[in-house]
Amino acid sequence: MDTDTDTDTDTDTDTDTDTDVTNVEDIINEIDREKEEILKNVEIENNKNINKNHPSGYIREALVINTSSNSDSIDKEVIECISHDVGI
């Protein structure tokens, strides 16, 4: 009669938890990097839009000169409306 005894001992070290934690940290770091990149791109686009939508120094100077005159012309009223709309 052959009796087979199991001499194997299962030494299951739990490395899955360490791997999972590392993966979660990697994912969080990647999300943070992507978030920073997105915020930087949004800031760049906002600056482009501010520069594009804001009147140049020449227009601003002309508005100041024309609105500071004493005449009550229609041009002055139009210029005042424009300057108010663009936030000067």
From Swiss-Prot:
Q: Spell out the residue ranges making up region: 9 X 2 AA tandem repeats of D-T.
A: 2-19
Q: Which InterPro entries match?
A: Orthopox_B11R
Which is an annotated Pfam family here? Orthopox_B11R
The UniProt keywords, alphabetically, are:
Repeat
Q: What induces it?
A: Expressed in the early phase of the viral replicative cycle.
UniProt region (Disordered), positions on chain: 1-22
Q: Where are the sequence repeats?
A: 2-3, 4-5, 6-7, 8-9, 10-11, 12-13, 14-15, 16-17, 18-19
List compositional bias (Acidic residues) regions by residue number.
Answer: 1-19
Family under the similarity heading: Belongs to the orthopoxvirus OPG197 family.
How is this protein named in the record?
Answer: Protein OPG197
Q: What is the species listed in this Swiss-Prot or TrEMBL entry? A: Vaccinia virus (strain Copenhagen)
Lineage, opening ranks: Viruses, Varidnaviria, Bamfordvirae, Nucleocytoviricota, Pokkesviricetes
